[in-house]
């Protein structure tokens, strides 16, 4: 009979992870189950950094950014011997089920543990929104709000000084942060991984905006496209006539209090995860589709192709080009 549930967060942190942790703890305790936190992800698991917690632990964490139980990356977890050690530790603690919050790598670890006898449920915790089995990942909403606020602030000062700002945002190989925040922030040019503009194209477009006498320009780009955005800024400046500066937002996108939407989604998914565990089901990835919380086998979730954002990007890009070409 199931008596104990474990929780770990793995990989890069994201806002809303603590709301998911709180959701697991509160739901499990309401069902009469003990909850155990595992410090620092899979690294903590193989080192037996496991602690029992109660509802008091969950009471004040939903508003906090990051993950209060810590996270770490552990490439060695792919090793079958390391996986076996993790299973042995969980079984010794009589923890028969685990909620894993993280990205693709965390999902793969959860799948392997499920195959070895520990029922695992995975929740999509990453600001990048690159878990294809879920419309939105935990932390994405907060991240794009942070980026929009940064764009707003940069626009103020660029407008004051008649300048151009290039803003590089996170996303790994997914352009959703740049696309969503760029559109919401009123960017003039957006370059994402699947619709990447060349450095020369960006410089030429900024030059056209200068010719159209636009007072300020905001360019939003995804990371991992351009080797050095500061050098890109120098190129843009040399070709456009604008003094141009680059801002790399970096890890500011992963910190701070989660938005209401991230807390809400994370808590809902956590509740659903515990319900699946109580039903005796493991090896599932939880996500959202529209307003619905859904579950899929982890391996199926990992195999879903990413939906293209090219059409959304193209409509926005064409609209902006029409505006400044007619100016």
Curated annotation (Swiss-Prot):
UniProt GO BP: canonical glycolysis; fructose 1,6-bisphosphate metabolic process; fructose 6-phosphate metabolic process
Main location group: cytoplasm
Pathway: Carbohydrate degradation; glycolysis; D-glyceraldehyde 3-phosphate and glycerone phosphate from D-glucose: step 3/4
NCBIfam families in alphabetical order: PFKA_ATP (TIGR02482), PRK03202.1 (NF002872)
HAMAP family: Phosphofructokinase_I_B1
Enzyme Commission code: 2.7.1.11
Chain sites annotated for binding ATP: 12, 73-74, 103-106
Binding site for Mg(2+): 104
Keywords: Allosteric enzyme, ATP-binding, Cytoplasm, Glycolysis, Kinase, Magnesium, Metal-binding, Nucleotide-binding, Transferase
SUPFAM superfamilies from the UniProt entry: Phosphofructokinase (SSF53784)
Subunit structure comment from the entry: Homotetramer.
Residue numbers binding ADP: 155, 186-188, 214-216
Subcellular location: Cytoplasm
Function: Catalyzes the phosphorylation of D-fructose 6-phosphate to fructose 1,6-bisphosphate by ATP, the first committing step of glycolysis.
Source organism, top-level taxon: Bacteria
Cofactor(s) of this protein: Mg(2+)
Protein name: ATP-dependent 6-phosphofructokinase
Organism: Spiroplasma citri
Activity control note: Allosterically activated by ADP and other diphosphonucleosides, and allosterically inhibited by phosphoenolpyruvate.
The keyword Glycosyltransferase appears for this protein: no
MF (Gene Ontology): 6-phosphofructokinase activity; AMP binding; ATP binding; fructose-6-phosphate binding; identical protein binding; metal ion binding; monosaccharide binding
A GO-annotated cellular component: 6-phosphofructokinase complex
Catalytic reaction(s) noted: beta-D-fructose 6-phosphate + ATP = beta-D-fructose 1,6-bisphosphate + ADP + H(+)
